[in-house]
Amino acid sequence: MTDQPAKKVHSAPTLKVQLRSENAIAPTKGSAAAAGYDIYASQDCVIPGRGQGLVATDVSFTVPVGTYGRIAPRSGLAVKHGIQTGAGVVDRDYTGEVKIVLFNHSDRDYAVKRGDRVAQLVLERIVDDAEVVVVESLDESSRGEGGFGSTGN
């Protein structure tokens, strides 16, 4: 018998999902290569023109260790209807219902129907042990203090 190193078993990170009502729909990916998981509305609501609203999902989840969940807009809603998302960070220790803040930048009311995909959840890695150090000044960079489009002129 030879001494061979044990094979490493790679297990995929787990996104734990709790469906809190019969109207809840588990997040899904639109394709195998999609960056985010589609998040679904659990009930009908209306986002007023030039207003905002909170969309129920009746879903809670725990993101994998070392990540947080970023609630991101769906490009189709933005382009076709002027709908954007807001307040988009879900911490690993948050276990309540994830609700989606939608902003309507159009003049017309936008009707959300139960089962509509209203946002996407993107899992992003975090650095959770960075030490905060207060300094007198920062290292020089070629960009300097230029912001808000300064690199593209």
From Swiss-Prot:
Its EC number is 3.6.1.23. It comes from the Eukaryota. DUMP binds at S75, G88, D91, Y94, K99, R143, F148, G149. It is an enzyme of class 3 (hydrolase). Keywords: Hydrolase, Magnesium, Metal-binding, Nucleotide metabolism. InterPro entries: dUTPase (IPR008181), dUTPase-like (IPR029054), dUTPase-like_sf (IPR036157), dUTPase_trimeric (IPR033704). It catalyses: dUTP + H2O = dUMP + diphosphate + H(+). The keyword Metal-binding applies. Pathway: Pyrimidine metabolism; dUMP biosynthesis; dUMP from dCTP (dUTP route): step 2/2. Its cofactor is Mg(2+). One of its GO terms (biological process) is dUTP catabolic process. Coiled coil: none annotated. GO terms for molecular function: dUTP diphosphatase activity; magnesium ion binding. It holds the Pfam family dUTPase. NCBIfam families: dut, PRK00601.1. Homotrimer. Involved in nucleotide metabolism via production of dUMP, the immediate precursor of thymidine nucleotides, and decreases the intracellular concentration of dUTP so that uracil cannot be incorporated into DNA. Belongs to the dUTPase family. This is Deoxyuridine 5'-triphosphate nucleotidohydrolase.
